Amino acid sequence: MEKWENQDKILLDKNKRGKDRNWRGRKLLSLKLADIFKELGYRETLIERVETCGDTLRFIRREDGSLRLYQAYFCKNKLCPMCNWRRSMKYSYQTSQIVDEAIKEQPKGRFLFLTLTVKNVPGKELNATISQLTQSFDRLFRRAKVKKNLIGFLRSVEVTHNQEEETYHPHIHVLMMVKSSYFSGAGDNYVSQEEWGRMWEQSLKVDYVPMVDIRSVKEIGKGLKGAILETAKYPIKPIKLDVENKQVVGDLYNGLYRKRQLGYGGLFKEIRKRLQLSNVENGDLVYTSDDNDEMSKGTKIVAIWNATKQNYFVKNKGWN
């Protein structure tokens, strides 16, 4: 049995840039989410999973003083602030790996960022609309004109809330890698924004012209890879977690229920499989990068959430 020495110290965990990882703030937001689920009458098991998310965090304190998480329970709820922070890090790391490899294999490839939208919908229509959105995306990317110069893509479904109209705006962001020939060929290869709009309207099977945006990913400041990662962020925006806003939480939870928000195609899909990258949405949220230093080098640290003091307190033990 492990014996831990009580330190009664508040957890302090900083990233490589010296910024506080703010475990406490994220935990408090997760507890707020659990309270809202309770207010909305969701089942006890769901509420309990969110309430206990990140209750105990086990780290290795390394020689340089940095902490390495090696064990924790995360609830994996679609709206959980704690889990979405972990997913965001994992997604950024995996996207970086995929893009690095794709550029090595196709150095002349160019990157585009495509946004596909539909009309805003009320909360009760959100789930069905997201299904329609992803099915329409599949139809669009099966078209010969799209496939012709496509090397690979990653797509993400995002939903934003219009507070004034009390509606939701589901849309798809797509990072595309295309052959350089996409930009040549007197109309045979290049697809204008207007043509993307027409093809998206046909794929959606709607009687209105949906908004579409297509642009090249350009090197600005951070270089090409930095611009790509900035463009392809994890598709979850923070939502206001208070009881007055509870219906938005309910609508988003029901709308995203059993929906895959991320998808890969072409070379990106092949690379992801080759690198054996785990599922960002439902997979492990402890290991979010390749920071897998020898775990035996350091001191075991356990940080436990104190519900009364509303903070994480540290206990530690030398490694046997």
Swiss-Prot record:
One of the GO BP terms on file: DNA replication
Record's keyword terms, sorted: DNA replication, Plasmid
Hydrolase keyword on record: no
Pfam families: Rep_1
Amino-acid biosynthesis recorded as keyword: no
GO MF annotations, alphabetized: DNA binding
Family: Belongs to the Gram-positive plasmids replication protein type 1 family.
Role description: Produces a single-strand nick in a specific site of the plasmid, and this nick results in single-strand replication by rolling circle mechanism.
Name of the protein described by the UniProt record: Protein rep
Provenance organism: Streptococcus pneumoniae serotype 2 (strain D39 / NCTC 7466)
Gene: rep
